[in-house]
Curated annotation (Swiss-Prot):
<dbReference type="GO" id="GO:0003735">
    <property type="term" value="F:structural constituent of ribosome"/>
</dbReference>
<dbReference type="GO" id="GO:0009507">
    <property type="term" value="C:chloroplast"/>
</dbReference>
<keyword id="KW-0694">RNA-binding</keyword>
<dbReference type="Pfam" id="PF00189">
    <property type="entry name" value="Ribosomal_S3_C"/>
</dbReference>
<feature type="domain" description="KH type-2">
    <location>
        <begin position="47"/>
        <end position="118"/>
    </location>
</feature>
<dbReference type="GO" id="GO:0022627">
    <property type="term" value="C:cytosolic small ribosomal subunit"/>
</dbReference>
<keyword id="KW-0150">Chloroplast</keyword>
<dbReference type="InterPro" id="IPR015946">
    <property type="entry name" value="KH_dom-like_a/b"/>
</dbReference>
<dbReference type="InterPro" id="IPR018280">
    <property type="entry name" value="Ribosomal_uS3_CS"/>
</dbReference>
<protein>
    <recommendedName>
        <fullName>Small ribosomal subunit protein uS3c</fullName>
    </recommendedName>
</protein>
<comment type="similarity">
    <text>Belongs to the universal ribosomal protein uS3 family.</text>
</comment>
<dbReference type="InterPro" id="IPR001351">
    <property type="entry name" value="Ribosomal_uS3_C"/>
</dbReference>
<keyword id="KW-0699">rRNA-binding</keyword>
<keyword id="KW-0689">Ribosomal protein</keyword>
<comment type="subunit">
    <text>Part of the 30S ribosomal subunit.</text>
</comment>
<dbReference type="GO" id="GO:0006412">
    <property type="term" value="P:translation"/>
</dbReference>
<dbReference type="InterPro" id="IPR009019">
    <property type="entry name" value="KH_sf_prok-type"/>
</dbReference>
Amino acid sequence: MGQKINPLGFRLGTTQSHHSLWFSQPKNYSEGLQEDKKIRDCIKNYVQKNMRTSSGIEGIARIEIQKRIDLIQVIIFMGFPKLLIESRPRGIEELQMTLQKEFNCVNRKLNIAVTRIAKPYGNPNILAEFIAGQLKNRVSFRKAMKKAIELTEQADTKGIQIQIAGRIDGKEIARVEWIREGRVPLQTIRAKIDYCSYTVRTIYGILGIKIWIFLDEE
């Protein structure tokens, strides 16, 4: 049987780049890694609390962290930054203060920037959040998948594959359902493929959502 490799790790250095850019001594590496995880969790929790959207989409595509000796630069790529800025005009400053308190940055400055991504529904994380919201509202999974595919078609993507696994529609036996539209060449390294794996808690249990989006070929 074919071995499934993570499409992002498989393409690192060709079409994908790292989301954390910093160097450290081997003995301090694990601390740096934990710090990154905490920063990302803290930002996601803050956005979840302060962003009131009807669809329940946080809209965070990815969070990039660049570290220097005296500075931590955090860039948040969002699909709908307007919603965060409108609900909290001083939201970014508040978030910066919260993070500085949390990490006790005495000798390091922390800087947060928010960047809008051009086509939000061409991003698998935002799409997975959309599907998760639909499944929580007990929309049938096929309907949710089809709606997600319609949204990506508007974002000019070349192909998409969506997979949902678990107790779908509350059935007794867990199963895997998937749908593909267009081309998704997972074996081609020069193909720019974005991928995300997302878990959603429904009343019947946990469902896993995986999304592969074929953006372009280099």
